[in-house]
Amino acid sequence: MQLTELIETTVTGLGYELVDLERTGRGMVCVYIDQPAGITIDDCEKVTRQLQHVLTVENIDYERLEVSSPGLDRPLKKLADFTRFAGSEAVITLKKPLDGRKTYRGILHAPNGETIGLEFERKKGEAAMLDFTLADVDKARLIPHVDFRSRKQ
Protein backbone atom coordinates (compact mmCIF):
# COMPACT_ATOMS: atom_id res chain seq x y z
CA MET A 1 0.00 0.00 0.00
CA GLN A 2 1.41 3.41 -0.97
CA LEU A 3 1.89 6.13 1.64
CA THR A 4 -0.94 8.32 0.29
CA GLU A 5 -3.39 5.43 0.24
CA LEU A 6 -2.32 4.32 3.72
CA ILE A 7 -2.74 7.81 5.19
CA GLU A 8 -6.02 8.45 3.37
CA THR A 9 -7.49 5.16 4.61
CA THR A 10 -6.45 5.99 8.18
CA VAL A 11 -7.71 9.60 8.07
CA THR A 12 -11.07 8.75 6.48
CA GLY A 13 -11.47 5.84 8.90
CA LEU A 14 -11.36 8.39 11.73
CA GLY A 15 -14.08 10.49 10.03
CA TYR A 16 -11.90 13.18 8.45
CA GLU A 17 -11.07 14.18 4.88
CA LEU A 18 -7.48 14.07 3.64
CA VAL A 19 -7.02 17.44 1.94
CA ASP A 20 -3.34 17.19 1.09
CA LEU A 21 -0.17 15.28 1.87
CA GLU A 22 3.40 16.51 1.52
CA ARG A 23 6.59 14.57 2.07
CA THR A 24 9.88 16.45 2.18
CA GLY A 25 13.32 15.12 1.39
CA ARG A 26 14.24 15.46 5.05
CA GLY A 27 11.77 12.79 6.15
CA MET A 28 8.97 15.13 7.21
CA VAL A 29 5.40 14.07 6.46
CA CYS A 30 2.78 16.86 6.51
CA VAL A 31 -0.87 15.79 6.54
CA TYR A 32 -3.72 18.29 6.07
CA ILE A 33 -7.16 17.19 7.27
CA ASP A 34 -10.61 18.74 7.30
CA GLN A 35 -14.25 18.06 8.11
CA PRO A 36 -17.40 20.17 7.63
CA ALA A 37 -17.35 21.41 11.26
CA GLY A 38 -13.69 22.47 11.00
CA ILE A 39 -10.59 21.10 12.69
CA THR A 40 -9.48 21.51 16.29
CA ILE A 41 -6.19 20.76 18.03
CA ASP A 42 -7.82 17.66 19.52
CA ASP A 43 -8.63 16.43 15.99
CA CYS A 44 -5.00 16.90 14.91
CA GLU A 45 -3.77 15.11 18.03
CA LYS A 46 -6.14 12.18 17.47
CA VAL A 47 -5.05 11.75 13.84
CA THR A 48 -1.36 12.16 14.75
CA ARG A 49 -1.54 9.38 17.35
CA GLN A 50 -3.27 7.02 14.95
CA LEU A 51 -0.91 7.80 12.06
CA GLN A 52 2.18 7.34 14.24
CA HIS A 53 0.92 3.88 15.14
CA VAL A 54 0.04 2.96 11.54
CA LEU A 55 3.34 4.26 10.10
CA THR A 56 5.30 2.30 12.70
CA VAL A 57 3.35 -0.93 12.07
CA GLU A 58 3.74 -0.51 8.29
CA ASN A 59 7.47 0.24 8.73
CA ILE A 60 7.27 3.60 6.93
CA ASP A 61 10.46 5.61 7.40
CA TYR A 62 9.87 9.21 8.51
CA GLU A 63 11.59 11.70 10.82
CA ARG A 64 8.67 13.94 11.78
CA LEU A 65 4.90 13.93 11.33
CA GLU A 66 2.77 17.09 11.25
CA VAL A 67 -1.02 17.03 11.11
CA SER A 68 -2.94 20.28 10.70
CA SER A 69 -5.94 21.94 9.11
CA PRO A 70 -5.50 23.19 5.55
CA GLY A 71 -5.95 26.78 6.74
CA LEU A 72 -8.22 29.54 5.50
CA ASP A 73 -6.58 29.51 2.07
CA ARG A 74 -7.05 25.77 1.67
CA PRO A 75 -6.23 24.12 -1.63
CA LEU A 76 -9.04 22.84 -3.82
CA LYS A 77 -8.05 19.49 -5.31
CA LYS A 78 -11.18 17.38 -5.77
CA LEU A 79 -14.46 18.06 -7.55
CA ALA A 80 -16.15 17.73 -4.14
CA ASP A 81 -14.04 20.69 -2.90
CA PHE A 82 -15.40 22.91 -5.68
CA THR A 83 -18.95 21.80 -4.84
CA ARG A 84 -18.49 22.43 -1.10
CA PHE A 85 -17.02 25.89 -1.61
CA ALA A 86 -19.31 27.12 -4.41
CA GLY A 87 -20.02 30.80 -3.77
CA SER A 88 -16.58 31.36 -2.21
CA GLU A 89 -13.81 33.48 -3.66
CA ALA A 90 -10.88 31.54 -5.09
CA VAL A 91 -7.78 31.91 -7.23
CA ILE A 92 -7.29 29.36 -10.00
CA THR A 93 -4.05 28.82 -11.91
CA LEU A 94 -4.47 26.88 -15.13
CA LYS A 95 -1.86 24.56 -16.64
CA LYS A 96 -2.16 26.33 -20.02
CA PRO A 97 -3.07 29.97 -20.68
CA LEU A 98 -6.61 30.79 -21.75
CA ASP A 99 -7.14 34.15 -23.47
CA GLY A 100 -3.51 35.01 -22.67
CA ARG A 101 -3.62 34.37 -18.93
CA LYS A 102 -3.24 31.46 -16.55
CA THR A 103 -4.38 32.96 -13.22
CA TYR A 104 -7.98 33.91 -12.50
CA ARG A 105 -9.57 35.23 -9.31
CA GLY A 106 -13.31 35.15 -8.78
CA ILE A 107 -16.37 33.44 -7.32
CA LEU A 108 -16.70 29.67 -7.67
CA HIS A 109 -19.85 28.21 -9.18
CA ALA A 110 -21.00 24.68 -8.38
CA PRO A 111 -19.72 22.11 -10.87
CA ASN A 112 -22.05 20.99 -13.64
CA GLY A 113 -20.90 17.46 -14.35
CA GLU A 114 -17.13 17.75 -14.78
CA THR A 115 -17.22 21.46 -15.68
CA ILE A 116 -16.48 24.03 -12.96
CA GLY A 117 -17.28 27.72 -13.29
CA LEU A 118 -15.47 30.78 -11.95
CA GLU A 119 -17.10 34.20 -12.30
CA PHE A 120 -14.35 36.80 -12.64
CA GLU A 121 -13.98 40.45 -13.63
CA ARG A 122 -12.54 40.70 -17.15
CA LYS A 123 -12.38 44.50 -17.09
CA LYS A 124 -13.55 47.02 -14.52
CA GLY A 125 -17.24 46.20 -13.99
CA GLU A 126 -17.38 43.55 -16.74
CA ALA A 127 -18.14 40.06 -15.39
CA ALA A 128 -17.13 36.96 -17.33
CA MET A 129 -17.33 33.22 -16.74
CA LEU A 130 -14.39 30.84 -16.93
CA ASP A 131 -15.40 27.21 -17.50
CA PHE A 132 -12.74 24.60 -16.75
CA THR A 133 -12.24 21.03 -15.56
CA LEU A 134 -9.98 19.59 -12.87
CA ALA A 135 -7.61 18.43 -15.61
CA ASP A 136 -7.08 22.11 -16.60
CA VAL A 137 -6.08 23.18 -13.07
CA ASP A 138 -2.48 23.56 -11.94
CA LYS A 139 -3.39 25.09 -8.54
CA ALA A 140 -6.59 26.28 -6.90
CA ARG A 141 -6.97 27.93 -3.49
CA LEU A 142 -9.65 29.69 -1.50
CA ILE A 143 -9.10 33.38 -0.82
CA PRO A 144 -9.63 33.95 2.91
CA HIS A 145 -11.73 36.84 4.17
CA VAL A 146 -11.26 37.75 7.82
CA ASP A 147 -13.04 40.66 9.47
CA PHE A 148 -11.09 41.66 12.54
CA ARG A 149 -13.45 44.54 13.28
CA SER A 150 -16.63 42.54 13.81
CA ARG A 151 -17.46 41.48 17.34
CA LYS A 152 -19.73 38.80 18.63
CA GLN A 153 -22.55 40.13 20.76
From Swiss-Prot:
<dbReference type="Pfam" id="PF17384">
    <property type="entry name" value="DUF150_C"/>
</dbReference>
<keyword id="KW-0963">Cytoplasm</keyword>
<dbReference type="InterPro" id="IPR003728">
    <property type="entry name" value="Ribosome_maturation_RimP"/>
</dbReference>
<keyword id="KW-0690">Ribosome biogenesis</keyword>
<comment type="similarity">
    <text>Belongs to the RimP family.</text>
</comment>
<comment type="function">
    <text>Required for maturation of 30S ribosomal subunits.</text>
</comment>
<protein>
    <recommendedName>
        <fullName>Ribosome maturation factor RimP</fullName>
    </recommendedName>
</protein>
<dbReference type="GO" id="GO:0006412">
    <property type="term" value="P:translation"/>
</dbReference>
<dbReference type="InterPro" id="IPR036847">
    <property type="entry name" value="RimP_C_sf"/>
</dbReference>
<dbReference type="GO" id="GO:0005829">
    <property type="term" value="C:cytosol"/>
</dbReference>
<dbReference type="InterPro" id="IPR028998">
    <property type="entry name" value="RimP_C"/>
</dbReference>
<dbReference type="InterPro" id="IPR028989">
    <property type="entry name" value="RimP_N"/>
</dbReference>
<dbReference type="InterPro" id="IPR035956">
    <property type="entry name" value="RimP_N_sf"/>
</dbReference>
<dbReference type="Pfam" id="PF02576">
    <property type="entry name" value="RimP_N"/>
</dbReference>
<dbReference type="GO" id="GO:0000028">
    <property type="term" value="P:ribosomal small subunit assembly"/>
</dbReference>
